[in-house]
């Protein structure tokens, strides 16, 4: 398995005025988004630069502050064309090039605001795992879907809108997201996402892990205040942040897959106490037909605190698909 780390997208946000956004609307082709009944709050999108890596969102309000948001795909912006799988690794040199291209786009749409006035509103820490087969992507996606949720995090399915039930079920089948108030974590099949959303086909089998940090979390993690310096600082911490998050999910990079029979053999031959072995066997057997580790904990009737401790020590997880008898064990049990 090959891993590739970097930045997929980030967003910049700055305060504006009603009249300034009105001038931008006059000069550019805008797509109208949601608005309230009396048009006191309106949302617009400038999609002319989306293929080049920048989507511009305008929030125009008579009763609240108005905002301009830039959603930036830095790899596409620097390449001047859409890069579906490339991840950005910022350096001081590439950041200068990035700011130059952003300044050019802002001048073209008629926004005179300095780039320094923008704030980093969202940052996506991204890790792409490359597998040899699509079945491996589905297998690991199922493992994540069955993982133990951390406190204050909740699963966030795709909203059911005007799309058909088939598309809605397909989206939730190929992606999994959990979130709290300040960050969200998504795992999804990148090839499926590109095919369905962007009509782009790729040969690579990629499982994308994406940790999205909000403005609140960014301010806690960064000592710098300028958005360009924050990008550099966050990128330096990215590996440690992602590894820490995966560790909290009890799914570190060191985890490996074994069969159901192998799992029982590992438990039997380990140096664990007989009482612990008995509980681990119960967990493995109950995991065979449960949809999540939370359901396993209820069926085994092991105390929640003890169950979490055992997950931390032994990192047991099982694939969601019953026909695929795989159990992932961490190095602690296998040692």
Regions found by a protein language model. Name each.
Residues 306:
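Residues in the helix-turn-helix
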